[in-house]
Amino acid sequence: MNFKYIVAVSFLIASGYARSEENDVQSLSQREVLEEESLREIRGIGGALLSAGKSALKGLAKGLVEHFANGKRTAEDHEVMKRLKAVMRDLDSLDHPEEASERETRGFNQEEIANLFTKKEKRILGPVLSLVGSALGGLIKKIG
């Protein structure tokens, strides 16, 4: 009788342990799925913010170009306007990567293409921000 009792209790313990292991595996896979979804959402938000930032910079650059185009310009203003036009061309090429320098991207795989444009964005955003900052500083000095 004791042997049957020991076997029954052992079986219950083993089945309970197996169920808990199964639940742990399921919860891990659910957590992984949730983490993946969270990462996708974060990437989507980051892409949207980058797109909004590019649009804002393009709008600001257009406004500055129009301002410099309509007034009297010094040599420095002329140089700033040329830089702003170049920045606007670069920002447009970021929006339409398939049209931007096909020679550059010919023969590369998709990951290398993405890396090229990420590097281009980084290379452009730094000077753009400093250029916009200096242009705004110049405008504020003239107004003030």
Curated annotation (Swiss-Prot):
Biological process per Gene Ontology, one example term: killing of cells of another organism
Cysteines joined through disulfide linkages: none
Propeptide part(s) removed at maturation, as residue ranges: 19-43, 74-123
GO cellular component, as recorded: extracellular region
Tissue: Expressed by the skin glands.
PTM sites of type Isoleucine amide: I143
Cleaved signal peptide residues: 1-18
Keyword Magnesium attached: no
Swiss-Prot/TrEMBL keywords: Amidation, Amphibian defense peptide, Antibiotic, Antimicrobial, Cleavage on pair of basic residues, Cytolysis, Fungicide, Hemolysis, Secreted, Signal
Family matches, as Pfam families: Bombinin
Top-level taxonomic group: Eukaryota
Cellular localization per UniProt: Secreted
Family in the record: Belongs to the bombinin family.
Function of the protein: Maximin-z shows antimicrobial activity against bacteria and against the fungus C.albicans. It has little hemolytic activity. Maximin-Hv shows antimicrobial activity against bacteria and against the fungus C.albicans. Shows strong hemolytic activity.
Protein name in UniProt: Maximins z/Hv
